[in-house]
Each structure stands twice: as structure tokens, then as C-alpha cells.
Amino acid sequence: MDNAAIASQSNTPPSNGRSSARFVTPISVHSSPITAEVIEPSSPFSPPSPSTLLTSLSKSPSHKISNLQMDGAKTTCLEVLQNSSLVVDSPKRQDKSITGSKAKPASTMRHGQRTASHKMATQTEIQTVDGDRLIVSPKTRKKKAATAKRTRKQDGVAERRLHGHVSKVKSPGDLKLDAKIPPSKPCDNKAPSVGDNTDNELERQTGGLQLEKATKRRLDWTPTKEGPIPMVDLAEVHSSSCGKSVIRTHSAGTLLSNYGFSGVVNTSLAPMPETCDNGPTTKRLMELQNFYSASGIQTPTESRPATNDSQSISSKQQRVKVKKPQKAKLTTLTSYVTAKYSVVDQTADLDRIETVNSGKNKKMGVTKRTSGTERANAARGKSDTLKNGNGPPVFKVVPPLEAFKSFDGQELLFGTSSQLEHGHSEDQDEEIQHTADSINKSNVVPRPAVSKGLGSSLFRLSSSKNLWSASSRDLTGAVLQVDEIDLSERSIEVSTPAAKYKRKTGIRDLSGQNVIDVEKDTRTLAANIDTRELDNMNEPSLAEDDLVYRENLESTNAKLNSQTPANISEAMLERPLPDKPIFGGFTTSELAKQVAAYGFKPIKSRDKMISLLEKCWENQSKSSKLEPKPNQRNHKSQGDDLAERQLLGLKPRSDSISFVNTRSPKKRLAKTSVKSQESKSFSLSNEGPRITSKLPMKRFVSPCAILIDDDQSSDSVGEALPLSPSHSSNGNGTLHHPQDCDEIHAPTTQMAIRSAKSSISVSSTTNLPSLSSQITKAVQSQPRIRAFKGLKQPTWYEKILMYDPIQLEDLAAWLNTGGFGLIGEDREVGAGVVREWCESKGICCVWKKQASAKSH
């Protein structure tokens, strides 16, 4: 092929009329790939050297394969005319490569068939620009294959680049695309050429994994500050020189140095760098709003009013909200306690009163709107004065519906009642008292009349600061003064033990001269309370009851002092003596006390102490053998008898109706005779005053000769002691009176037990305790017995605990002789009663093999 013909063909216009178009015509030349022919008008057959081609390639700014340019546009090429068919088809192929159209004419298909084997052949590209020069560049097979791939791939890439590369804020999808393909920044608006991008991608594919660039891309994951264009150039390519500068361009080192939380979080995406850097966070805004006002958290729009009107409105709202913490209610004990020591304004202590007054003022305003009366107007005027603090709060009666609504406005104070102490002054306490009174009036709750009887001084508001005073309150809710309350209540309790004692032991008062009067008067008090005391008992005042109690004692002492010494000595002689106690049932300590009471030295032997006490008791009983005449005792009133009994420290009993003048061991009769005589006295006890004439030996009505002293001595276990030593000294009694008092502590005798069984009246049997409970009490109260000759002698209670068989006859005999005497019981029990008691308690009991002939 001749080069001159090629040059001449380049000057000839093509047949399709595209003389000024740029086209590329591939021509197969059987030569080496590095051979490039440059046709010039001056030297048309001088080829360029390879070094010249390499230099042109390195200096090309677009990284294209350097093309040799030759001047002289009027060169003729004859050989191109011979190959006109190939030259005619070449512009179509160039249009296909540039425009990316998919239309393939028949000539192009033939060209494709003809050039199908060009992969293995060398190609030469000829470019004609405006007909001035020819550019001839050799193409290798490898680059041809890459060129075909680059054309198809770069078409799509170029479209994506042109579609996404705009001067706006990129979306996260665009950022990911840019991270994969580094963006190029051309200064002109032309589309990037296909050859540049394909060459860069080829170099990236042949460069390996590029671990350093991947590490730089990982730094983009950290949450850094976002600018208006959140684009990070990892290749450290700064803004282009075309005038469109990037605001936020960080390098890898800058990102790493800025990594961390600086305390400022930017949530806005607006292009305002000063807002992102200097703007306060949300929490700081909340703190500032809470510092300047007590209102809730305001939004940024609320904290930045736009106009002056909005500023004035917001300032008014802030002023209103600032006052609210001063009027906060104290609903916990902690707030009340800490309010005394906190450095707050002085209105903190008046919170409760102000809230109550404000609530009442609102209610008065509602009353005015509903009723419209002049009273509501007056109430409103007074409430205005209350706000100013000029006078005490005055409350009016409101309608019932509004009064019930007032319950909803009541304050709740959390805490125990003993801790609800108020630290207000006396004036404030008075205001609180007025408030409580008004609430009671509005609720129409009448104040009970009992409170007046308790004294007005008790309802005074408490000024003490202890918790106990705060816990006690009256019916109106006010605090009581605990120091002024008389908690003794002695006069009210005077009748209580007497009533209990009557229920236990069947005590009846001697309110008349016969047994019938005693049985009817079952509701009277103890012996030291007369009819005048009964009237005083009905009075509720505690102070008056105390005075009544003292007056009763003084009246009793006056009666005793008014008696002559002869009457007192006669009364002492007339006092029935107790029967001989069973000293064998006493403990050693009790025996030692009895011996010491008689003035003897301590004795070690138990038997000697018992014998000595028996002799002392017999000698003492012989000294009181005189018997007074019956007519001298019948005219005495009941008050004198009660005075004498109080002097002697004895308590009256309903079953012990008559008194025995004197008693000695010589006059102890047989059991059968005594029982017959007692049965006669029991039958005659209902005949009234007639009995006094038939039985001259007795005082009132009872003919029993052995009742009183036995019963009184049976109750003498800690109960029949004299009231006080002053009472016994006022009576100017005989010398042996202290000995009688010591003897009262002794248990009862057999005569006392026998006499009590027949002397119990019908009315008193219902009040006596059951025998089962008395047996249990007697068994448990038995003192421990000293060992005899090294052998322990267990008590009945210890035998029961050890599951020893209990002999019924022995236990019944012990109860009748000494067991009941320990608890002051006068009745007797038989073996059958003891058996029932044992079976009810689950106690093992047996009968004796030889039945005893004695009747107990």
C-alpha cells in the first residue's frame, strides 16, 4: 500500500458529505506494532523513531496514546482510493463508538465479519481533523481487545458519572458510588473521554488490592461533623480550580485527628458552620431554660421569639411561672423538716395557709357567680383583705354542693400521725385552727357536748415541739397539750377492780340489814364508797372524780376518829379470828417470815418452826375470848360496820354475811354438828330481821358461827391487806393487831372450807369461778417440797408433767386440806370432780385399791 495514495485520499471529501467530521478508520497493516508512519508535505516517506513516540505518550495530558501529527492537508493517497469501500464504512463505525448507537447496517456487518480476526492482527488508526492533518497511531491486539471492552463498559459508567456528578448535596447512595470510583474534577463541562477513565480503571485493576486506600475509606465511617456537602476526598484531592470550591474537604489525617466527642452534637444539615461549631446542645438549652425560669423545657422556637410581641408575651409567661415554686405545696415530711433550715424566703413557712386561703377565695368567687348575693360580695372583699394579710381569715357557709367539692381541694400530707408536727408560730396555729373550724362548719358536723365536760384547757393548741404532742388531737383536729391531760383516772377505776373482784369471788355489798338487801344490790361499789360516791361517779370530769375519791377517804377516817376507844376495842374483840392455818403447807421461806413476825430468831428445823407457830397462834387466839352482848351490836349501822372492816383491812363478801365474835380451838365442833348448824343457818337466812332475835350470838341475820373469819382469811393471800398503815394507826387498835395482819396471809383452815360450802347464797353461785379452773390454779400454785432423807418429793404439778398416775382420793384430799387454801378457794371437791378434771386435761388418774372411809 502506498503512503502517497493515503495522503491524497485524505484530502478527497467523502461521499457522504462529512468533510469536516472527525472519524477514525482502522486499517490492517502487515507491519510491526510499533511502526508508525507520519506523513508530512516536506518529507512524506520519513517515519518517526520509537523514542519520539514514547516521549509524546508520556507528555500527553489526557493519558492517550500519542498520535503523530503531520502537516499538509493536501497530501494525496492513491492506495486509499483503491480501498474506498473500507474508507466509506469507517465513519459509521466511528459514529457507533461515539454515540453508542446500536444500529448496524449491512456494510457494518460485513466490516465486522471482515475484521473478526483483527484480535490477532495489528491495527492502525487514522484520524482526520478538519482536513488539515492526519494522525496515525499503531494499535496492538491487546489494546484492541481492551478498547472493545472499555467502549461497552465506559458507556454505562459515563452515563452514571454524568447523572450523579452535580453541584448539590449528595445522597448516601452517591457517596458509596464515589467511594468505589474516585471522582475526577474537570474544569470544563464536557463529558469525560472514554480513554481516560478506562485507562485509570485498568491501572486500578492491575494495581492489586490497594490496602492503604481501603483503610482510608474505612475512616469515612466515623460520625464526624457534617457540612453542607458531606463529601470526603480520601485521595487528598482538594477543590477544583473551576470556581466551585468544596466547603468540607478532609484528608485522612484530619479525620483521624478530629475523631472523638467534643461535647457538641450537630443535628442540622443547613450550610451554617457557625451553628454547627458554636451552637449549644439540646441539654444545654434545657439547663439554661430551667435556670432562668421554672417552666418546662421549651423548644428552640419558643426560646427565640421572632417579634417584640412574642417577646413580651413570653416574658409575662416566665414571670408567672417563676412565682410557682414559691407557692409549691409541702406534701412530704422531708419538705417540712428541711424548710426550717433552708435559706429560702420567709413565705415558705406560710405555704399551707396561703394555699388554704387561695382555695377559699376561689370558692367564694364561685359562690358569688352562682348566687350573686351581697354576702358573696362581702366574702370576696374579706378574702381580698386576707390576701394582704390585714386580718384573720373569715369563712362563710357555702352551699352543700360546694362544701362537698371542697374535699377535692384538701391537701394530703404523707407521714405517720406521730410525725405530723407543724413548725408554725402561734399566730399561724390560730389561723389553722380557724380554718379547721370553718371546714367543720361547712360540713355541718356538730361538735359533741362531751368535749365541754373534758375541760376547755385541754383543747388549747399545743406549743410543744415533741412528737407525742403532735400525735394527740381533739375532735376538731387541733393538737392537744399532752401535759395538761390527767391520765390517772383514779376515780373511774375505783369501781373497776371491785367489780372484777365481785365476779371472781362473789363479793356483795352490805347495803341493808338482811341478806335479801345484799342480794338485790349487786351493782354497788366497794365497801369504801357510800351512796354519795355513787352520785359523783356519774360525773365525767376527771378532777371531780379525784376529789370524790379523796372525800370518801376523809369521811371514812372521820367516822373512825369519831368512835370512842371502847367501841374500837369492842370492835376488835368482836372481829372473828381465823381458824388455825396449816403451817405444814407453807414453804420454808414463808415459815421463816412467820417466825420473824413473832419476834423469834431464825430456826433451821422446819418442824420446830411449825410447832412454834402453832403455839403462837393458840396463845394469840386465847387473848380474844370475850363475847359482847348481842343487843349492843344490833343497833349499829352499816356504815360503822364498813368502817370497822376497813380499819382491819378486810373486804366484805356476799357469802360471809355474819361475823363471829370470838373463836378458839376449843370451840371447834365435830364436822357433822357444824354442817347441821350451818344448814339451819342457811335455811333461816331468808327470813329477814326475824333471825336476830332467834340467834342472839350473831350480828345481823346469818346464824353461821364460823363464816366470816374463814372467808376473809381465805381471801388473805395478798388481797385482804389493810389499805395503808395510817388507817390502822388512826383506829388506835389493840397491840395484837399487827399480829392479826400477819396471820391474814396464812392459808385457810378446814373449818373455813367446810363453812364456805354451805354459806354460799343462790345469787353468788353464778359468779363463782368453775372448780376445774380452781383446781388447775391450786395445782400450779403448790410450792416445791424439800427433799426428805435424800428423796425428792415432787409436787402434784411435777407428777402430772412426769406422767405419773394421779390417785384421785389423794389429790382431792390435798385440795380440800391445803390446795384450795393457796388460792383462796372455800369450796370442797370430791374424787369424782377431780376425776372429771383429770380426764378433761388428759391426766393419767387411778383410784385407790382400798377406798377410804373418811368423807372429805
Curated annotation (Swiss-Prot):
Gene: SLX4
Posttranslational modification: Phosphorylated in response to DNA damage.
Biased composition, class Polar residues, residue ranges: 1-19, 296-309, 673-686
Key word Zinc present: no
Region (Disordered): 1-24, 39-61, 88-121, 139-201, 296-326, 362-392, 621-640, 653-688, 715-742
Protein's job: Regulatory subunit of the SLX1-SLX4 structure-specific endonuclease that resolves DNA secondary structures generated during DNA repair and recombination. Has endonuclease activity towards branched DNA substrates, introducing single-strand cuts in duplex DNA close to junctions with ss-DNA.
Gene Ontology process terms (BP): DNA recombination; DNA repair; DNA replication
Assembly and binders: Forms a heterodimer with SLX1.
Pfam families assigned to the protein according to its UniProt record, in alphabetical order: Slx4
Lineage: Eukaryota, Fungi, Dikarya, Ascomycota, Pezizomycotina
RNA-binding recorded as keyword: no
Composition skew (Basic residues), residue ranges: 139-152
Keyword field: DNA damage, DNA recombination, DNA repair, Nucleus, Phosphoprotein
Protein known as: Structure-specific endonuclease subunit SLX4
